[in-house]
Structure formats: structure tokens, C-alpha cells
Amino acid sequence: MRTSILVIAAIAVAFLVGRLSAQGVEPSCKLCSAVYIPASEVEQYVAVAHATNPIDQQMRSIDLGRARVQVALVHRNKLDAPAPRSVAEHDLVSEVYYILSGSGTNRTSPEIVDAQRRPATDRAVRDLNGPGTNGADLRNAETQQLKAGDVLVIPAGTGHQFTKIDDHITYLMVRVDPDKVVPLMDEAASRKYLEQNRR
């Protein structure tokens, strides 16, 4: 009984110390507004993907104080085998995929075979996910069979590659950009992009 009381007292003290030490913490993004992207806007990006076939479309790039976060829509068509040198790696930006529709096979590993730097002028480097490499293959890769509803988290520095897509795969991607290497994109820029790419 005495041991139980001591454990409970220790937990209470730890909680109180934690609460007191947390009182001096300031928000990392003071007075920042929330960002809302309605389903109707996401659907417009899906329509652009079907009409013009851009694989990766940035919808927003948001400053959160100490970091930035990007929200993108990615649509990939049927793939029977991977293209040469299609392993991608991003040095500073992590990615989270939420699969909306379709299915495919993705491989991931931090061990990239014959990695070569992407040029700074590359659209992906400049506008989407910052500096990184493309590689010929992955060593010790893990394979994920992705389908609607699945989530895949790819840390910065980890190579990733679709090796097969059954019919298509469409996913919402959230990029975590702590070094702020990706330019900002607001709602007005999104509207302009959609107007320019409507068919």
C-alpha cells in the first residue's frame, strides 16, 4: 500500500513539474491563421490531374512559424514497371501520403544505389520538395502495397519508388519542411494555378 501511495505521489509531482515548466513555452506560430482547403478545391486538382496529367500539384505551402508544411495532390497513372532512375529522395523534406483512391506498390529505404543530385533548376527541387537525389535502385528496401485509406510516412533522406500501379493511384501528400526550402503558396496562387490549367 505504501509503495502505491509513493508511486501516485511521484506521478503527481512529475505532472505538476511538467505543468509548471510548460508555462513558459510560447507558440511557434503566434497569431497564425488556420488554413482550410475545401473538398471542391481538391476535386478541381483531381480534374486537372486527369486532364493534363501533372503528377504532383502543390495546393498550399504554409508558414507555421518554425517550419513550413505543404499540401499537395498527387495522381499517378497505371505503371507496369518502374522507370529507370525513378528512386527519389528529398534531403530536407519529409512526406506523408494519404491514399484517396487506386492502389500500387511502393518501395522505401535510406540506402540508395547510384544516387545523383537533382539540379537546382528541377521543378521538384525548386517548387515541391527541395534538394535531393534520384537513384537507380534501393538496397534492403521495404515494400508497401498501398490502397485507399492507407498512410505512408517517408522521412527526409529515405529513398522511395513506385514499382507498380494497378490502374491509378491518387493521394493527398503533406510535406513537412522544417528548413523552409519550399516557397510559400497561398489560396490566391492556388486559384490562379487552377484557372490556368482548367480544360
Predicted regions span which residues?
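Conserved metal-binding segment of the jelly-roll/cupin
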Residues: 145-166
